[in-house]
């Protein structure tokens, strides 16, 4: 019966075969051990932990059974969308900043979700208000763990764990081997699945790096000419700051080059609209901070342009 649930979910997602990382995770994450899964952004980690949940979620149970912590609103919504597309009987609720907390509470109380997906700050708010019972949660998943640390969510995540007395299992997913990982596992024996080295070799074979030299005063002109050369191929242009995204977007607009911008200072509907247009191909250029590098499912990106160099190797890994 349980295998039928997995097969049905895969059919609904139109996925014929899992990749090696997903197969390994399905085997280990459904067991009793804690799991650390190290794999690059965009490698399919979402399925790697959602599928095993189908083997452990209790049917006909109105309590919250699983908590998934993520660093961004977009990732929360993406995970929610994937789970809903599986066509299972269990319900979910997304909780994140910028969304009315009263609506989230109403959804939790009225819909009885088995899974709550949220950012650490908003989950902390719900717990402080007693909006759901944390004692029934048996599985904690932290996706994009390294990015959550980078965002300064260490203390919130640690505090949330102290409020989950019924916790039986933890799953941590990260695109880098962050040194803080052991702090958040160890509830049970821990299995570490490391697919970073394999993916690094694959990425090295897949990526072609090109350096474009330009004086600072000509940088926008150089970017404009490069994007014109790339034509209709989809491109993400990464900047290190929100104001830089806005400035580059406006300067390209002045040159009649159509692009969307994407950063954490934008209103949520505007961010969702920008991602939607980029994903469906109606816009070929997305100018973004590293927010677009945080586990978002953006298929078939042809080119990554580092308008500003990434601040460290981890940022480079996430962007690419």
Language model features with spans:
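Conserved helicase RecA-like core
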Residues: 1-320
